[in-house]
Amino acid sequence: MARIAGVDVPREKRVVIALTYIYGIGRTSAQKILAEANVSEDTRVRDLTEDELGRIREIVDGYKVEGDLRREVNLNIKRLMEIASYRGIRHRRGLPTRGQNTKNNARTRKGPVKTVANKKK
């Protein structure tokens, strides 16, 4: 396995797919990186030369990926919660932050159903 940005990318996959194993790099970013590094998207990771791997590593180092990106996202959410913005309050309560309705669904964010006992007749 080749190591790029602290992540072991799979040897058998095409480079464009293997790069998406790095947190913060999707298909589009992977394609841009490979175009900049002059590497074919169809090349398998095992077929890359050390020179090509070095160029890819150099370009990926310019991106905010893995731990740095996770830290930035968490700090952004924490900042929203501290300033008590609407989005921050929704994060704090564990509810959807992007305007979805919560009357019926949103079970993923709200967690399992908390049943309320019925009133006896």
UniProtKB/Swiss-Prot annotation:
GO terms for biological process: translation. Residues 91-121 are annotated as: Disordered. Residues 106-121 have a biased composition (Basic residues). PROSITE patterns: RIBOSOMAL_S13_1, RIBOSOMAL_S13_2. One of its GO terms (cellular component) is small ribosomal subunit. The keyword Methyltransferase does not apply. Keywords: Ribonucleoprotein, Ribosomal protein, RNA-binding, rRNA-binding, tRNA-binding. One of its GO terms (molecular function) is structural constituent of ribosome. Located at the top of the head of the 30S subunit, it contacts several helices of the 16S rRNA. In the 70S ribosome it contacts the 23S rRNA (bridge B1a) and protein L5 of the 50S subunit (bridge B1b), connecting the 2 subunits; these bridges are implicated in subunit movement. Contacts the tRNAs in the A and P-sites. Part of the 30S ribosomal subunit. Forms a loose heterodimer with protein S19. Forms two bridges to the 50S subunit in the 70S ribosome. This is Small ribosomal subunit protein uS13. It comes from Macrococcus caseolyticus (strain JCSC5402). The gene is rpsM.
